[in-house]
Design a protein with these regions (language model features):
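Post-HExxH zinc-binding segment in Zn-dependent metallohydrolases
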Residues: 289-330
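Inter-helical turn/loop segments and adjacent helix faces that build the functional surface
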Residues: 122-130, 167, 190-199, 279-286, ...
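Contiguous, non-catalytic segments that form substrate-binding/exosite surfaces or channel walls
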Residues: 109-260
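Secondary-structure capping and boundary motifs in well-ordered enzyme cores
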Residues: 45, 105-108, 135, 207, ...
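C-terminal, non-catalytic "cap/extension" segments appended to globular domains
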Residues: 2-9, 25-31, 35, 41, ...
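A glycine-rich, aromatic-flanked flexible loop/lid motif
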Residues: 234-236, 274-275, 331-343, 354-362, ...
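A well-structured
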Residues: 1-166, 468-471, 493-502
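Active-site recognition of the HExxH zinc-binding catalytic motif
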Residues: 13, 151, 260-279, 297-301
Length: 502
C-alpha cells in the first residue's frame, strides 16, 4: 500500500481504528444483552452471530495492508504528534499479537466464551461445577496456548498478566502479596480478638424495589450523568463502556443483604466515572478507555472503599438509608452503620469481602491461576483446591461450589490473569489518596461539603482524561511517584486500629 503523505497513512490508521471500535461496540451490546435480559436458552443463536463477528474482526485486525500502514508510520514517526505516535505503538502490538493467533482458534475461542458464560451462570445457580468443568478445561488450555502466541519468550502466566497490566509478572506479585500478608494476617488476628461489631441489621429483609431506588440515589451522590450511564441487573456485577458518552454498569440484588448491591453500585460507579472522564480525543481510537485493569480497579476500589466506606460518606447517605428502610434500621445510628459496613471477618464471597480480608481472596485466585496455567492443578481438582486454600488463608469451610469456585464470572469469560488487578488497584488507590491529601487536604472528611467534586476533579485531571495515552506504570508514576505498597498497608493498619480500638 502506497501513501503520498504521512497524514494520509494516519488517516487510514484511524479509519481502521474506528471500524474496530464499531465492531467492539456491537460485540459489547451483545454481551450486555446476554448477561442482563436475554432468555437463558438463547446462547446458540447469539453464538452464531458472535462467530460471524469474530471472523470479521479477525480479518480486519490482521489484514496485510494494515501492517503496511503501521510500517509506513513507523518510518515517519518524526512527523507525528505524541498521540499519533502512541496510536502507532499500540496498533503494532495489537496487530502482531493477533496475527500470531490462527484464525480458526481465534473464532473458536469467541464461540467457546459465549457458551461458557451461559453454562457458568446455570452451573452457579444449580451448584453444579461438573457441568462447567469441560468449558473451563478448554478455556485454560486455550489461554495457555494463546499466552505462547502473545509473548513467545515469556512465561505463560506472566504473558496473561501482561494482557491486563503491562510489565506485571509473578515475581512482582509474589513480592507484593508477601508484603500484604505481613500486615494483613497479624492485623486480622488482632481484629478477631477485639470486641465484635454487630452488623446483623444489614442482613434483614430489604425489598428489592427499595434497593433499586437506593441505587439510583447512590448514582446521584456519585454525581454520575444518567443521560450517559445507566444500571442493569445481572448475575455478576460489571461495567462496560462503548465510548465516553455511553457507559453501562450492572449490579445484583439480594433481599437479605443491603450492603451487597450498595457497594456493587459504588464499585461499578467508580469504573463508570473513569470511562466517562476519558478525553473526547481518544474516542473510537485504540487509546480509548482505561489505561489498564489495575488502574481501572484503583478507581472502582477507591470509590467503593476509600470513599464509600468512609464515615463522612456514611453520614451523608444515612438519612436516605433510614428513609427507605426505617423498620430494618430501627435503633441504628450512623456510627453503628459505619462500623457495620466496615466489619472485618473471614468470609466466602470476594465481592462482599471487607477491605482487610479482600486481598486474601485475590491471593487464593492468583495461586490457583498460576497452577492451572502451569498444569500443576487439574480443572477437576479446582473445587478441592479452592476449599483447601480458603481453609488455609481464611480459616473457613466452603459449604458449596456456588459460594466457592463458581462465585466469579471471570474464568468463564476467559479472564485468567485479571484477579491480581483488584489487589494492585486497592494499593494504587491508597497511594493516590496520600498524594491527593497532600495537594488538596482532607477531601474525604469534607465529602458532603464539596469534597466529592474536588476528588473527582483531581482524579479526572490526573488519571481519567488520559485514557490509554500513557502506559499504566508511566501514568501512575507521573501522578504518585514510584509505587510503594506501604501506603496501602499503612492505610489498612490505621483504619482498622481505630475502628476496632486496637
Amino acid at each position: 500500500m502506497q501513501f503520498e503523505t504521512t497524514m494520509q497513512a494516519l488517516s487510514a490508521l484511524r479509519e481502521w481504528e474506528q471500524t474496530m471500535a464499531a465492531y467492539s461496540h456491537a460485540e459489547g451490546v451483545l454481551y450486555l444483552d446476554a448477561t442482563t435480559v436475554a432468555p437463558k436458552d438463547t446462547w446458540e443463536g447469539r453464538g452464531k452471530t458472535m462467530e460471524i463477528l469474530s471472523k470479521i474482526t479477525y480479518e480486519l485486525s490482521t489484514r496485510e495492508e494494515n501492517g503496511e500502514i503501521i510500517s509506513f508510520l513507523e518510518h515517519h514517526l518524526e512527523e507525528l504528534d505524541l498521540q499519533a505516535k502512541r496510536e502507532v505503538e499500540v496498533a503494532r502490538k495489537q496487530f502482531d499479537q493477533t496475527r500470531r493467533v490462527p484464525a480458526e482458534e481465534y473464532i473458536a475461542y469467541s464461540v467457546l466464551l459465549n457458551q461458557a458464560q451461559s453454562v457458568w451462570a446455570e452451573a452457579k445457580n444449580n451448584n453444579d461445577f461438573a457441568s462447567f468443568a469441560p468449558y473451563l478445561e478448554q478455556i485454560v488450555q486455550t489461554n495457555r496456548k494463546f499466552a505462547g502466541y502473545y509473548n513467545p519468550d515469556m512465561d505463560a502466566y506472566d504473558s496473561l498478566l501482561n494482557e491486563y497490566e503491562e510489565g506485571l509478572n509473578r515475581q512482582i506479585l509474589d513480592d507484593f502479596f508477601d508484603q500484604l500478608r505481613q500486615t494483613i494476617v497479624p492485623l486480622l488476628g488482632k481484629v478477631m480478638k477485639a470486641e465484635p461489631i454487630d452488623d446483623r441489621f444489614l442482613y434483614k429483609h430489604y425489598p428489592i424495589d427499595k434497593q433499586r431506588i437506593f441505587s439510583d440515589y447512590l448514582m446521584e451522590v456519585l454525581q454520575m450523568d444518567r443521560s450517559h450511564c445507566t444500571i442493569a441487573e445481572t448475575e455478576h456485577p460489571y461495567t462496560t463502556n462503548f465510548n465516553n458518552k455511553d457507559v453501562r454498569i450492572t449490579t445484583h440484588y439480594h433481599e437479605d443483604s443491603l450492603a451487597s448491591s450498595m457497594y456493587s453500585v459504588i464499585h461499578e460507579g467508580g469504573h463508570g466515572i473513569y470511562e466517562l472522564g476519558c478525553d473526547d480525543c481518544y474516542n473510537y481510537s485504540n487509546l480509548a478507555g482505561g489505561a489498564s485493569m489495575s488502574i481501572h480497579e484503583s478507581q472502582s476500589r477507591f470509590f467503593e472503599n476509600i470513599v464509600g466506606r468512609s464515615r463522612p460518606f456514611c453520614q451523608m447517605i444515612f438519612p436516605k438509608v433510614k428513609e427507605l428502610f426505617p423498620e430494618q434500621l430501627e435503633g441504628v445510628d450512623v456510627d453503628m452503620f459505619y462500623r457495620a459496613v466496615n466489619k472485618a471477618q473471614p468470609s466466602l464471597i470476594r465481592t462482599e469481602a471487607d477491605e482487610l480480608t479482600y486481598c486474601l481472596h485475590v491471593m487464593i485466585r492468583y495461586e490457583m491461576e498460576k497452577q492451572l496455567i502451569a498444569g500443576t492443578l487439574q480443572v477437576a481438582d479446582v473445587p478441592a483446591e479452592w476449599n483447601r486454600l480458603y481453609r488455609e488463608y481464611l480459616g473457613i469451610e466452603v459449604p458449596t461450589d456456588r459460594e466457592g469456585c463458581l462465585q466469579d464470572s471471570h474464568w468463564s469469560g476467559g479472564m485468567i490473569g485479571y484477579f491480581p488487578s483488584y489487589a494492585l488497584g486497592s494499593a494504587y488507590g491508597a497511594q493516590m489518596l496520600a498524594v491527593m491529601k497532600h495537594e488538596l487536604g482532607d477531601v474525604i472528611g469534607t465529602i458532603a461539603e464539596g469534597g466529592m467534586e474536588k476528588l473527582k476533579a483531581w482524579l479526572g485531571e490526573h488519571i481519567h482524561r488520559h485514557a490509554c495515552f500513557y502506559k499504566p506504570g508511566e501514568l501512575f508514576e507521573r501522578v504518585c511517584g514510584k509505587f510503594d505498597a506501604k501506603y496501602f498497608t499503612d492505610y489498612l493498619t490505621e483504619k482498622f486500629t481505630v475502628l476496632y480500638h486496637l
